[in-house]
Amino acid sequence: RWDPWCTISGYHGVTSVVLGNCGFGFAPVAKEFRERSMLTMTRTEAIPFDSMKEGMDWDWETIPEYLDSLDRIPKGVNVIQYMPTASLMTYVMGLEKAKAGEPASDSERKEMARLLHEGMDAGLCGFSIQRLGPDSVQADYDGSPMVTDIMCDDDILNLAEVLAERDDGFIQITQGTGDIRADIAFLEILAEAAQRPILHNVVAPARQDPEVHRRPLRWIDGCREKGLPIYAQCGTGRAGFAFTLEHWNLYDASPAWRAVTTGTKEEKIEKMRDPELRQALMAEAEEADRRLQVIQAGVGGNPKSLVVQGVNRQADLQEFVGKSVGDIAEAEGKHHIEVMLDLSLRGDLNVEFLGPDKGSNAEFMAEMMNE
């Protein structure tokens, strides 16, 4: 809506996109929940709130109305849409109950199934989920888990049964609760229940160890041999993440980082100056790094390895460009977390960091794509 050309996709030669990944979207959305849903997108995807507010005319509430609206506007790419499960749950259950992690009632499950049927009749391709547990690496605007992060198995299987009944559609799921055996077991249960393709996020290569991507691919091969239609979505990006602390949430597996990076820009600045919160970040640094390694979606990596890429066009910070946070910390005799926070504050949270390029092994990428 704020970019009908889907510019970033087009820049990379993508001509068709699927909207609503990871369970979040803008329909169905009650009128009084519109602004809250935009705040969620601001937090999770760094889309400026003002851009959304100006670019979205909100001439819909339901999925059929949204798809009709999407059909009317000019677009630069082809699009299809998932049912965003977080939006569906909030619409039916209310935010408070959905956020509490309570299972849906029988009547709520029936209504969610009805709305999924209705949406697929109107053109949806299936439904999507992000389930990353209470310490989700990608939290909501207020720092709480996304609705689907703490969604129970039975509520997901209720939607899977809709696809099985229709023999139509597919499921995109990012499942990473920290218990890999339980996660794998649930994906197999989900595939058995739906009997429709499951798009598993994400298989990503390391630079040197091929077992990092071969292990999950062997599991997927085994699933296919059992008749379970599970497919891997593979990460083949050739660069690390570039980000500023004004818009960054992929350290959310760390409660200390989550506390500091939620709220308005002014609130974030105040928190980053707070001695107690800074100390909590430093004290939790090793634990945060461990969690980010366990939860694969923690793509930012260890803050020590981040490289300063942009400094808000400030001449007084230019000397830091091209240096790693760890090297700056060693030179200044400071903790690397202090360096990251201090540079960000000096640059009005617009200092840009570049994460490590963890997957640029062309041989491994080709192996995944040709599997």
What are these regions (language model features)?
Residues 67-74, 116, 120, 160-167, ...:
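Structural signal for hydrophobic packing residues in well-ordered secondary-structure cores
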Residues 96-103, 116-120, 124-255:
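Functional cores that coordinate and move charged inorganic groups
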Residues 2-127:
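Divalent-metal coordination cores built from histidine and acidic residues
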Residues 223-227, 231-363, 367, 371:
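Hard-cation-handling environments
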Residues 52-56, 102-106, 145-150, 173-180, ...:
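Hydrophobic alpha-helical scaffolding
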Residues 37-56, 155-162, 229, 259-262:
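Short, basic, helix/turn surface patches
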Residues 15-17, 77-81, 125-126, 169-170, ...:
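Structural motif
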Residues 4, 57-61, 65, 74, ...:
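Conserved active-site and cofactor/substrate-binding residues in soluble primary-metabolism enzymes
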